[in-house]
């Protein structure tokens, strides 16, 4: 039986991640691990991972799996673009789960006291991206307009250095 959801996503919490956002992080992800994508949405991240030879499966609140109440068995690490309205709660929960993770989050998150308080408790790494990610927005779709803010990969147990620089190359056609 699926757990009941406690959070109703806001209209801007359903932004889909284009495949190219994973290009910089993929070389650092362990192919021997089973990856869990807990905010799967339309499945862009999980699909991109599988297309690149990773074992990855996803769950989502829209299909009845509330990340804050549900934790599947058999996964080694998590990768997701969490709903930004819940970014601090999401970070707290993933730290509590005690496994490696990669979260695609706004760069400004690292400057917030709440995030810093959580991050002081674990070893973590960040991947700064040279360009902004143009997310597929729930209302506008992918209209080619520039992203509103820069994002980074916030990780624990993934990257070889505390700070890594990643290169985004925009494709001619995005997911």
Residue ranges and their predicted role:
Residues 1-175:
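Class I S-adenosyl-L-methionine-dependent methyltransferase catalytic core
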